[in-house]
Amino acid sequence: MTSPSQVPLPPREPLSDDERIARARAFADELGNRRSVRDFSPRPVPREVIEACLRAAGTAPSGAHQQPWRFVAIADPEVKRRIRAAAEAEEREFYQHRAPAEWLAALAALGTDADKPFLEVAPWLIAVFYERFGVDAEGHKHKRYYPHESVGIATGLLIAALHRAGLATLTHTPSPMGFLNEVLGRPRNEMPYLLLVVGHPADDCRVPAIERLPLEAYASFLE
């Protein structure tokens, strides 16, 4: 077995424990203001912001370092219109026929329905895909390891980066999402993971009155 090629770890800024604690708390506090938004402003967002946030997403760890994420950033109004039409068709079917009563009850508190105007109003949509398998230049298939987990981590970094840039987001998951491959011309080895709506919140934006779990409800320490 050959030894992997290695390079020195890039240097990091030295910090005291107090500085680390302060940074960690400030970051947690900033993310504490993050909310999913459904009322967006059409105000433009420079492509450079989206590019930088996608670069951050691309730093995520991945199974066997295969980096199975694929992102399609969409600002074209006609493409957004087609996505909205297809998504709303699936959502109407979901709300009227496929969704179990328990799921609909859980969604009721969020005020969601089959109408998705934000898919056209928001300046950017980012379609997130994961590779089910890789395909080399000769057309041979190659297994992807932990693609769901890898793309989930990358998407979390993307959402955090967009929030840090002062933007609002919404994770949208119409079911099924196969129409995204057709509308966006993606190959069959890529599966839609979610659709991220990105932009500035509308001036009159309101969000559901919900509370997050306290730390002790979801984390434990063994010291």
Language-model regions: role of each:
Residues 56-58, 109-114, 180-182, 205:
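Glycine-rich, charged/polar anion/phosphate-binding loops
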Residues 67-151:
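Glycine/small-residue-rich phosphate/adenosyl-binding loop
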Residues 31, 53-57, 196:
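Short alpha-helical scaffolding segments that buttress acidic/His motifs in well-ordered protein cores
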Residues 2-23, 113, 191-223:
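C-terminal helix-cap and adjacent tail motif
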Residues 180-193:
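Short, electropositive alpha-helical surface patch
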Residues 1-37, 41-52, 93, 97:
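N-terminal accessory segments that position/regulate proteins before the catalytic core
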Residues 58-65:
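Glycine-rich phosphate/pyrophosphate-binding beta-alpha loops
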